[in-house]
């Protein structure tokens, strides 16, 4: 309540200190709240190491698992396999987790190849759980594939034109 200032005068430092004390004593709710605060970087400066530390203290909760998955998609902490694992653990009770898995499998990631069938499975689960965005992805999945193909071809042409330009420049120096 010190953080929100709802029933007490707002004192963010005191609120963070109390949450830290509770989290360090094993309070999973405090761990989750503190982890999210450090992950979001709105109340305090973003600190992904602290976010990870506190979220891991409460990792059995599906909301914490979702937050951990989002953490592992951050550039500084990027580990796609951990993100997929935590989204998967959270997906039974969190339709946003299954939606995110659908996106990851549809668009692919650094060490994870695209898998349209997996994407459809996750989007279907998410849509069946009430996620309208997942339903929109299912309704338009071929459009996204065509856009991906067009972007890939365009990127190849850009790379090819750079190679041709470099070769031309080297030949005409």
Locations of regions flagged by a protein language model:
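Structural signature of tandem alpha-helical TPR/SEL1-like repeats
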Residues: 9-18, 45-54, 76-86, 112-122, ...
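Canonical positions in the second alpha-helix
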Residues: 21-22, 57-58, 89-90, 125-126
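Alpha-helical linker/edge segments of TPR/alpha-solenoid repeat scaffolds
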Residues: 43, 142-160
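TPR/TPR-like (Sel1-like) alpha-helical repeat modules
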Residues: 58-60, 117-132, 139, 153-157
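Low-complexity, charge- and small-residue-enriched intrinsically disordered regions
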Residues: 159-173
């Amino acid at each position: 309540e010190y953080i929100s200032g709802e029933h007490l005068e707002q004192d963010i430092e005191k609120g963070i200190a109390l949450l830290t004390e509770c989290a360090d004593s094993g309070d999973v709710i405090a761990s989750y709240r503190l982890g999210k605060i450090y992950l979001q970087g709105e109340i305090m400066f973003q600190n992904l190491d602290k976010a990870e530390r506190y979220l891991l203290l409460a990792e059995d909760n599906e909301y914490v698992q979702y937050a951990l998955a989002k953490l592992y998609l951050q550039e500084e902490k990027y580990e796609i396999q951990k993100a997929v694992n935590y989204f998967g653990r959270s997906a039974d009770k969190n339709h946003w987790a299954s939606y995110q898995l659908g996106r990851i499998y549809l668009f692919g990631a650094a060490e994870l190849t695209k898998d349209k069938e997996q994407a459809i499975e996750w989007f279907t689960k998410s849509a069946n759980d009430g996620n309208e965005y997942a339903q929109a992805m299912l309704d338009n999945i071929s459009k996204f594939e065509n856009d991906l193909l067009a972007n890939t071809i365009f990127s190849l042409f850009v790379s090819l034109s750079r190679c041709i330009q470099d070769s031309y420049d080297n030949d005409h120096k």
